[in-house]
Curated annotation (Swiss-Prot):
SMART domains: AP2Ec. Keywords: DNA damage, DNA repair, Endonuclease, Hydrolase, Metal-binding, Nuclease, Zinc. It catalyses: Endonucleolytic cleavage to 5'-phosphooligonucleotide end-products. The gene is nfo. Signal peptide: none annotated. This is Probable endonuclease 4. Zn(2+) 2 binds at residues 143, 177, 214, 259. InterPro entries: AP_endonuc_2, AP_endonuc_F2_Zn_BS, Xyl_isomerase-like_sf, Xyl_isomerase-like_TIM-brl. CDD domains: AP2Ec.
Length: 279
């Protein structure tokens, strides 16, 4: 069982491993830099050495770690300057993951800003293909979206169509976010519905391509398109659904990463404990 959460790199990037260990994680996700800007500080030799050393000491499997793209890039944008900056950031992040020994980089698929799904997907595929040319073993994971206006890749069929256009295939995989899937319209509230939803995912995308699972309950209801993560078992998906998802991921040996809120109801420590109980 590999379960953990998104952890902070505040102070230095190796602190993320300390934060993961403190939360009793057997998997974790980070931003490799400040996610709210375009500029990234170069990783120093010490940054890289300390991160790798602590990860080795932690006994957390390297293949249960991933990084997430920063917030600003939009790979589906029709704006050429924004597109070029987004692709450059993606390539840079792939290289940073390679330096740190992180095997997976999760990316959002972006917004076509009203130009239509076909145009957005064309730009997205172009950008991802460019990043796929990097000469390392980092795999870029496409994350399904919640179905917000102008987004692409919410529907498993469309996600599969995007995924199958990407070359070389070995450079790409998928990250499934349970909150996004649920608020798009995939029912995950019972064991039977979880089985049905993952069966549809397998049909169009392929379970073998699912490398990381983002385990989040949803603040909203089924099909509402509200991208608001919530505490496990306390949202629209509920305890039965979350439990069935955890059991499925464990059976398939897919690392589970929580991106749940920290508030008066629960923190990361409690949500991780809850996830382990559901297993």
């Amino acid at each position: 069982m590999q379960i953990g959460c998104h952890v902070s790199i505040s102070g230095s990037i190796d602190k993320s491993v300390d934060n993961a260990v403190e939360r009793e994680c057997s998997a974790f996700q980070i931003f490799t830099r400040n996610p709210r800007g375009w500029h990234a500080k170069t990783l120093t030799k010490d940054d890289i050495t300390n991160f790798k050393s602590k990860l080795k000491e932690s006994k957390i499997d390297r293949f249960a770690t991933c990084a997430h793209m920063p917030y600003l890039p939009n790979l589906a944008t029709p704006k050429e300057d924004g597109f070029e900056k987004s692709v450059k950031t993606l390539v840079d992040e792939v290289e940073r993951c390679a330096q740190l020994g992180i095997p997976y980089l999760v990316t959002h698929l972006g917004s076509h800003l009203g130009t239509g799904e076909e145009a957005g997907i064309k730009k997205l595929v172009k950008g991802l293909t460019e990043a796929g040319k990097t000469k390392n073993d980092v795999m870029i994971l496409l994350e399904n979206t919640a179905g917000q206006k102008n987004s692409v890749g919410s529907d498993f069929k469309q996600l599969g169509e995007i995924f199958k256009q990407l070359k070389p295939a070995k450079k790409f995989g998928v990250c499934l976010d349970t909150c996004h899937a649920f608020v798009f319209g995939y029912d995950l509230r019972t064991e039977a519905k979880v089985k049905e939803t993952f069966s549809e995912f397998d049909k169009y995308v392929g379970i073998d391509n699912l490398k990381i699972l983002h385990l989040n309950d949803a603040k909203g209801d089924l099909g509402c398109n509200l991208d608001r993560h919530y505490h496990l078992g306390m949202g629209g998906i509920g305890e039965k659904g979350i439990s069935a998802i955890v059991k499925f991921a464990n059976k398939k040996k897919i690392p589970i990463i929580l991106e749940t809120p920290i508030d008066d109801d629960r923190d990361d420590f409690e949500n991780i404990r809850k996830a382990k109980e559901f297993a």
